[in-house]
Amino acid sequence: MSLLTEVETYVLSIVPSGPLKAEIAQRLEDVFAGKNTDLEALMEWLKTRPILSPLTKGILGFVFTLTVPSERGLQRRRFVQNALSGNGDPNNMDRAVKLYKKLKREITFHGAKEVALSYSTGALASCMGLIYNRMGTVTTEVAFGLVCATCEQIADSQHRSHRQMVTTTNPLIRHENRMVLASTTAKTMEQVAGSSEQAAEAMEVASKARQMVQAMRTIGTHPSSSAGLKDDLLENLQAYQKRMGVQMQRFK
């Protein structure tokens, strides 16, 4: 796996799924391929994206700044500086300085990532802030190692939180989660189906599923009533794709 592929993988792992994720992936690909060289426009676009957390925006801004060639005097962006300030916690800043000194001695991406992984997310963000604000310099490889270590920590905590929700025994949370997933799957079916004649059936199934979820939420139903709802939808979607000659992995 090439360095840039690895960076793209780690960065995208912390972006919530949805159309915006696809857009960000495309921007990253363009930047890494040298196709997008307007850093100013890129940062303005990033600043106004909805849904993304300030830290995710800060990390993406840091990656764009590292990768896109720019004039030396180009102004640093406030939204990135704020996100990479470690919440103003002096402990984070102290640790960030210690980490920075260690990173100065590293020359490889993997070496930097290993060193960085033993620090907290706040310290890692502050260290990125030091480099972003030109208060310290490291090689691009080392900076990318720092980025990937930060993303790995964030993705780990997101995964733990997701696993807790999936394995929760609270029937109300499980019920709501199944309905949310069914609704999202139905939306995806409508997008995948397109406008061909064969798509009508898939669209109808998706539409009925969304109506059912709406009705279940409106009248309030027994927590077990949503069981299998998403799986039924996925089976319908796969059957439709088979008829269309499209093979797509299950997105359970």
UniProtKB/Swiss-Prot annotation:
Annotated spans, RNP-binding: 165-252
UniProt-listed InterPro entries: Flu_matrix_M1, Flu_matrix_M1_C, Flu_matrix_M1_N, Flu_matrix_M1_N_sub1, Flu_matrix_M1_N_sub2, INFV_M1
Keyword Membrane: yes
Pfam family, one: Flu_M1
Keywords on record: Host nucleus, Membrane, RNA-binding, Viral matrix protein, Virion
Location within or outside the cell: Virion membrane; Host nucleus
Region described as Membrane-binding: 1-164
Main subcellular location of this protein, as a coarse class: virion
Membrane topology category: Peripheral membrane protein
Record motif Nuclear localization signal, residues: 101-105
Protein's GO biological process: viral budding from plasma membrane
Gene Ontology molecular function: RNA binding; structural constituent of virion
A cellular component annotation (GO) from this entry: membrane
Protein's UniProt keywords contain Transit peptide: no
Signal peptide range in chain numbering: none
Family to which the UniProt record says this protein belongs: Belongs to the influenza viruses Matrix protein M1 family.
Subunit structure: Homodimer and homomultimer. Interacts with NEP. Binds ribonucleocapsid by both interacting with genomic RNA and NP protein. May interact with HA and NA. Cannot bind NP without genomic RNA.
Additional comment: Most abundant protein in virion. When expressed alone can form virus-like particles in transfected cells.
Function in brief: Plays critical roles in virus replication, from virus entry and uncoating to assembly and budding of the virus particle. M1 binding to ribonucleocapsids (RNPs) in nucleus seems to inhibit viral transcription. Interaction of viral NEP with M1-RNP is thought to promote nuclear export of the complex, which is targeted to the virion assembly site at the apical plasma membrane in polarized epithelial cells. Interactions with NA and HA may bring M1, a non-raft-associated protein, into lipid rafts. Forms a continuous shell on the inner side of the lipid bilayer in virion, where it binds the RNP.
Protein's UniProt name: Matrix protein 1
